[in-house]
UniProtKB/Swiss-Prot annotation:
It is an enzyme of class 3 (hydrolase). It is a peripheral membrane protein. The gene is lpxH. Binds 2 Mn(2+) ions per subunit in a binuclear metal center. This is UDP-2,3-diacylglucosamine hydrolase. Substrate binds at N79, R80, D122, S160, N164, K167, H195.
Length: 240
């Protein structure tokens, strides 16, 4: 058996191929897992659990079917869907996890997270993140009419795209010191995360021992998952 990790699907109605690929994954590979962990940015945007977008209901039903088959499903918020709440979690039968979680997997201690908090060189993004994670601001935003939230979200995505276009790739990647700090804080030799869309397995030193950082890929033209078993930790890409 295996525990599966995915992230950065960025599901939206404009990308039906990714949605179809995810549905096939949920109906196939995911059903044979010990557990499924979604490490953020499942959706391209999330403006509230009350959004009647049919895609959201479709995904909730598909994830719940995995849970109903006996495979527990877990979710860590990403920078795109950090407002995903308890209502959607109930509808999909997913367990919401904190932004950093340590798992005991087949004899390994594994730290999982979305990964955006590791990009500490991007001061502009970190300042923005601190603002939008303010509980009072989130409560105010979610109290706005749905059409207003849609406009605000569209403007924020456009601003983010424009800002990122002028940033260096290095600034938008993780900071190595932040990685080591997180791994030593939690006393782990394995870290799995997404966010950067740069799939790879990196070797480093943490806790004065060899350690590994496994980065999930985004679902653009193919799927990406990390498969953890008693024998191995694999970063796998697969066709939709």
């Amino acid at each position: 058996m295996a525990t599966l990790f995915i992230a950065d699907l960025h599901l939206c109605v404009e990308e039906p191929a990714i949605t179809a690929g995810f549905l096939r994954f949920l109906a196939g590979e995911a059903r044979n897992a010990d557990a499924l962990y979604i490490l953020g940015d499942l959706f391209e945007a999330w403006i509230g659990d009350d959004d009647p977008n049919p895609l959201h209901r479709q995904m909730a039903a598909a994830i719940k079917a995995v849970s109903d088959s006996g495979v527990p499903c877990y979710f860590i918020h990403g920078n795109r869907d950090f407002l995903l709440g308890k209502r959607f979690a109930r509808e999909s039968d997913m367990t919401l996890l904190p932004e950093e979680k340590v798992l005991e997997l087949y004899g390994r201690r594994v730290l999982i997270m979305h990964g955006d908090t590791l990009c500490t060189d991007d001061a502009g993004y970190q300042a923005f993140r601190a603002k939008v994670h303010n509980p009072w601001l989130q409560t105010l935003f979610l109290a706005l009419p749905l059409f207003v939230r849609k406009r605000i979200a569209a403007r924020m995505r456009a601003n983010s795209k424009e800002a990122n276009s002028s940033k260096s790739l290095a600034i938008m990647d993780v900071n190595q010191n932040a990685v080591v700090s997180a791994m030593e804080k939690h006393q782990v030799q394995w870290l799995i995360h997404g966010h950067t869309h740069r799939p790879a397995v990196h070797e480093l030193i943490a806790n004065q021992q060899p350690a590994f950082r496994v980065v999930l890929g985004a679902w653009h033209t193919e799927g990406s998952m990390v498969k953890v078993t008693a024998d191995d930790v694999e970063l796998i890409h697969f066709p939709f």
